Amino acid sequence: MYPKKTHWTAEITPNLHGTEVVVAGWVWELRDIGRVKFVVVRDREGFVQVTLKAGKTPDHLFKVFAELSREDVVVIKGIVEASKIAKSGVEIFPSEIWILNKAKPLPIDIWSETPDLATRLKWRSVDLKRPRNLVVFTVASAMLRSIREVLYGEGFVEVFTPKIIVTSTEGGAELFPVMYFERVAYLSQSPQLYKEQLTASLERVFEIGPAYRAEKHNTDYHLNEFISVDAEAAFMDYNDIMDILEKIMRRLASTVSEYAPKLEEVGIKALMELSNIPRVDYDEAVDRLRQLGYAVNWGDDFTVEMQKALMKYYGPVYFIVNFPASLRPFYTKRKDGEKSESYDLIINGIEVASGATRIHKRDELEEEMKKRGLDPRLFESHLSVFDYGMPPHAGFGLGFNRLVTALLGLDNVRHATLYPRDRYRVEP
């Protein structure tokens, strides 16, 4: 029986010189230079060198070494010694090695050249062993924790809303149908209507969960299943919500900076510093784009290329505010007639979040629905809530996969998604 792991590889430092430890992980590299042999062991946190030296290491371990292959699962017990030669400044001299499972030759190379994305995603579970991926998803987990902590600190309650629904949240047709016993239902594209309803009871709510959109996109920034961070708060407007988003973004920059050495080691140049985020009126953004030579009309939405171009004036992180009402969902509160109390949060040219002040009076909401060709009767279960004390409220929806992509400077949202689901991919 093998012993339990006592340390992550990253915890094996020169300070542990002379200490017996147990590490567990996968064989990353094997080197044989005669009387000295090396096993580099990988776990989630990094690497550690295990050194076998004739006259110092038990003889039977050289036979075990001969059986080892890359990616074999191992447990190793040994004594830590400080080293001026080992890359990490430390090595382990083993007293015992257990091979828990043998690995066949891998179908893709995770050590040197990176295969094309389609091949990597085909073998995603193997590809996730790559050190760069380990860092990306470890940082992503820390980012989620930080988002939760900020929202809890602002008095929000975490909720979970249905993902099987009977009508569209946005009033469109881009929904995935599912058979729900004897009737057709749909996968939820957003918790928007539920979180609005919850402001009439819980006041401030947020949800982190999957969302589904049957959009036939095939771009670097679109997925059909993604993790959405949604928040809604009573007695707030869009400026209040942007203030909260600013707090989240500053906290995230700080969180990411804690992983600076690991990110730099795998070649990721992340956004780690953030000052106040400028709030750019839509009209000003249109004028700036025209100055840059873009043929953009008032009422047009902005492309990723345009949003990247605006970084020249506003830096890598900025809000665009007060969009034309025609570009926003039906539940968005209007501002001065044709505009709206709305915003997008742009990071490195990518729209990562959108939000607005919402309409909180039933008659105004029904009127907005009719203007857009929607039948209020299809939304009766939602509209009825507005009859019993719906407060003024505002909120945001944030695409977490896009957020990770933008903050870490990745070139494709699939790199920030464990098992991506897009128009052409539904496995593994």
Swiss-Prot record:
It is found in: Cytoplasm. The record marks 87 as: Important for tRNA discrimination. InterPro entries: Aa-tRNA-synt_II, aa-tRNA-synth_II, aa-tRNA-synth_II/BPL/LPL, Asp-tRNA_synthase_2, Asp/Asn-tRNA-synth_IIb, NA-bd_OB-fold, NA-bd_OB_tRNA. L-aspartate binds at residues 170, 213, 354, 358. It comes from the Archaea. One of its GO terms (biological process) is aspartyl-tRNA aminoacylation. GO terms for molecular function: aspartate-tRNA ligase activity; ATP binding; magnesium ion binding; RNA binding. ATP binds at residues 213-215, 351, 399-402. GO terms for cellular component: aminoacyl-tRNA synthetase multienzyme complex; cytosol. Homodimer. This is Aspartate--tRNA(Asp) ligase.
